[in-house]
């Protein structure tokens, strides 16, 4: 039976139980614009709920997309009071982490402390680990808010992630299982090297390992939530070119191996030059190429929501421009009826 899904993200925007939405893909395909557009539509559709958009990409673009400065703490978007944004700063997070670790040992000459500092600074994927810690923090906050009335804290209905390019994102999503293995090795070390560690670290190592056990429980809960399609989904973003299509397929296969829900693909920068009296020969030639790969995507991902977004005449910056552009996530772009919007955005 041929079941063609709607070419929109309406099922995600209207979904009532989603807690986590990841937006990812190859570099330069419009992930930030797409994640910002999804966040804007969620905020517009549910004005009584609070939403948070987090950038985990070391090269942050959220501030540029909204024309508003964001930092490591959540800040409300001007013009959308129920949407907040934050950009995770790995250096600041690492500094906070080292300060927290120093409470267990104040001796600056301690060789164990020096060794741990060197290790954390050189571990591959430390940026992804720090981003994951931010996820753990929000999990913990949700638990507190669900357990008690705290009028000063904000409970976010859904958290949207503007992720780094594919490789970083896949490492980020591997962290739950990786951390469980790492924590298991730390447990083994505590048993074998316990007496020596106590001599070197002033007897505070037991507190550290107890803290790691608590982290392990939270990691397991995150893993459960990330693999629950009622709570988490992943939106793939690409452009209609061979390399982007190839990387999208690779990413989808990886996500499926992690048991993550992925059934939506946003294709950006489409020219829709067919039958356009204003298109040039170069546009027509490029649209012909785009259409070839669009047809391939239609066959390959017939059971996915395949959303086709137009290439506009200027940059999509600011809340008002994002509102105009993001409506095509819910209503398919019509080249004839909607062509005016291509040049109708406010320049920032």
From Swiss-Prot:
Gene3D superfamilies in UniProt: P-loop containing nucleotide triphosphate hydrolases
Protein residues bound to Zn(2+): 280, 283
Active site location: 57
EC number, as in UniProt: 3.6.-.-
Keyword ATP-binding: yes
Enzyme class: hydrolase
Subcellular location: Cytoplasm; Endoplasmic reticulum; Golgi apparatus
Coiled coil location: none
Gene Ontology molecular-function annotations: ATP binding; ATP hydrolysis activity; metal ion binding
InterPro entries in the cross-refs: Anion-transp_ATPase-like_dom (IPR025723), ATPase_ArsA/GET3 (IPR016300), ATPase_ArsA/GET3_euk (IPR027542), P-loop_NTPase (IPR027417)
Pfam families: ArsA_ATPase (PF02374)
UniProt keyword annotations, A-Z: ATP-binding, Cytoplasm, Endoplasmic reticulum, Golgi apparatus, Hydrolase, Metal-binding, Nucleotide-binding, Transport, Zinc
Keyword Nucleotide-binding assigned: yes
Cellular-component GO terms for this entry: GET complex; Golgi apparatus
GO biological process: tail-anchored membrane protein insertion into ER membrane
Binding site for ATP: 26-33, 241, 268, 310-312
Alphabetical list of PANTHER family matching this protein: ARSENICAL PUMP-DRIVING ATPASE ARSENITE-TRANSLOCATING ATPASE, ATPASE GET3
Family indicated by similarity: Belongs to the arsA ATPase family.
Chain's role: ATPase required for the post-translational delivery of tail-anchored (TA) proteins to the endoplasmic reticulum. Recognizes and selectively binds the transmembrane domain of TA proteins in the cytosol. This complex then targets to the endoplasmic reticulum by membrane-bound receptors GET1 and GET2, where the tail-anchored protein is released for insertion. This process is regulated by ATP binding and hydrolysis. ATP binding drives the homodimer towards the closed dimer state, facilitating recognition of newly synthesized TA membrane proteins. ATP hydrolysis is required for insertion.
Assembly information from the UniProt record: Homodimer. Component of the Golgi to ER traffic (GET) complex, which is composed of GET1, GET2 and GET3. Within the complex, GET1 and GET2 form a heterotetramer which is stabilized by phosphatidylinositol binding and which binds to the GET3 homodimer. Interacts with the chloride channel protein GEF1.
Protein name in the entry: ATPase GET3
Gene: GET3
């Amino acid at each position: 039976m041929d079941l063609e899904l709607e070419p929109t993200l309406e099922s995600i925007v209207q979904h009532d139980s989603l807690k986590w939405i990841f937006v990812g893909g190859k570099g330069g395909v419009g992930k930030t614009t797409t994640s910002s557009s999804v966040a804007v539509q969620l905020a517009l559709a549910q004005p009584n709920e609070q939403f948070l958009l987090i950038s985990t990409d070391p090269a942050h673009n959220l501030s540029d997309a909204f024309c508003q400065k964001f930092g490591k703490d959540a800040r409300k978007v001007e013009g959308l009071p129920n949407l907040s944004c934050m950009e995770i700063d790995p250096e600041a997070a690492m500094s906070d982490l080292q300060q927290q670790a120093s409470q267990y040992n104040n001796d600056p000459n301690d060789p164990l402390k020096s060794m741990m500092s060197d290790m954390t600074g050189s571990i591959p994927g430390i940026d992804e680990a720090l981003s994951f810690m931010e996820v753990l923090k929000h999990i913990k906050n949700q638990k507190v808010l669900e357990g008690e009335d705290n009028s000063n804290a904000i409970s976010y209905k859904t958290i949207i992630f503007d992720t780094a390019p594919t490789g970083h994102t896949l490492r980020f999503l591997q962290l739950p299982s990786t951390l469980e293995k790492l924590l298991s090795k730390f447990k083994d070390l505590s048993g074998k090297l316990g007496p020596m560690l106590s001599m070197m670290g002033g007897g505070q190592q037991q507190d550290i390992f107890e803290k790691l056990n608590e982290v392990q429980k939270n990691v397991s809960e995150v893993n459960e939530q990330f693999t629950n399609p009622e709570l988490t989904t992943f939106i793939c973003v690409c452009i209609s070119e061979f390399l982007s299509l190839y990387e999208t397929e690779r990413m989808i296969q990886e996500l499926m191996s992690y048991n993550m829900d992925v059934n939506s693909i946003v294709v950006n920068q489409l020219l829709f030059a067919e039958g356009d009296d204003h298109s040039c020969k170069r546009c027509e030639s490029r649209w012909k190429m785009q259409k070839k790969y669009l047809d391939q995507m239609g066959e390959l991902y017939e059971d996915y929501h395949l959303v086709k977004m137009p290439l506009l005449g200027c940059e999509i910056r600011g809340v008002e421009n994002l509102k105009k552009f993001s409506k095509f996530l819910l209503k398919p772009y019509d080249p004839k009826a909607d062509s005016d919007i291509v040049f109708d955005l406010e320049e920032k």
